[in-house]
Amino acid sequence: MNEEVEDGEVKPLELSSEDKAILVETLKNKLQALAEQHVDVLESLAPSVRKRVDVLMEIQSQHDELEVKFFEEKAALEAKYQKLYGPLYSKRSKIVSGVLEVQGETEEREEKGVPDFWLNAMKNNEILAEEIHESDEEALKYLKDIKWCRIDDPKGFKFEFFFYTNPFFKNQVLTKTYHMIDEDDEPILEKAIGTEIEWHPGYCLTQEVLTKESSESTKPITKTEECESFFNFFSPPQVPDDDAKIDENTAEELQNQMERDYDIASTLRDKIIPHAVSWFTREAVQDEDYGASWVDDEEEDDNNDEYSDEEA
């Protein structure tokens, strides 16, 4: 697959019109089916009920107009507070890395900062824990800080992963950028771009070398294969080149991969970065478990109520 590399970033292929149409065919079919169901429902109503539903739809339109303003004001408010968070994140980074000493520390200390802070914070989150493999952990111990910011042209957001000098790769900063488009007043992922990691020889974590013994007279056969790694996050799912045919199953698989990738990004942006110390101490894990338990209890109560009604 051909890719363009510029400024250390791998740019995804531009899709032909045919590929784009095939890739979104499944979604279009679903939307078409929903539209047909909408018409069927309206046509099945009695005239008097249909008039009432028409008024309800007008009310919904007014609600949707207000919702657009809500999202606009929400974006402005988020931008305001993101700037206010900045100094706090900076101080946190200095303490974690050992640049800033905390008052009241004893002079006798074996190591600076908070070792493995980001590694443990991410491992304590269920979604990210699935992405971090044992082979990744040593490299992630060199992770110094994670930042994110919104971008306007094109619209989206960007991650920066800052690393200490390490034996695994040359990059000091790994980035991941998400380009979004507005569709029906809701941001939709268009594409993601990740840094090309410059691995040191023999330290690549996204590939493994397999060796197969051959006859005594010849050398062993070796081949390189892709393997699971957290660092695949910086190589987002790509669509095959224009010559390849994308069937419905492939399109659905790509969609699932992109959704998974975006889930990881959302977790980093909305949970890990703003509440890193709570994930490090596992306080956030307890909060999530409590929330899930509360929902389960509510569902159980609802089920019990249903059984009681049936018995009555």
Swiss-Prot record:
The lineage of its organism: Eukaryota, Viridiplantae, Streptophyta, Embryophyta, Tracheophyta. GO terms for biological process: double-strand break repair via homologous recombination; nucleosome assembly. Belongs to the nucleosome assembly protein (NAP) family. May modulate chromatin structure by regulation of nucleosome assembly/disassembly. A motif (Nuclear export signal) lies at residues 45-60. The acidic domain is probably involved in the interaction with histones. It comes from Oryza sativa subsp. japonica. One of its GO terms (molecular function) is chromatin binding. This is Nucleosome assembly protein 1-like 4. InterPro entries: NAP-like_sf (IPR037231), NAP_family (IPR002164). It is found in: Nucleus; Cytoplasm. The keyword Nucleus applies. The keyword Isomerase does not apply. Keywords: Chaperone, Coiled coil, Cytoplasm, Nucleus. Residues 24-78 form a coiled coil. Residues 289-312 are annotated as: Disordered.
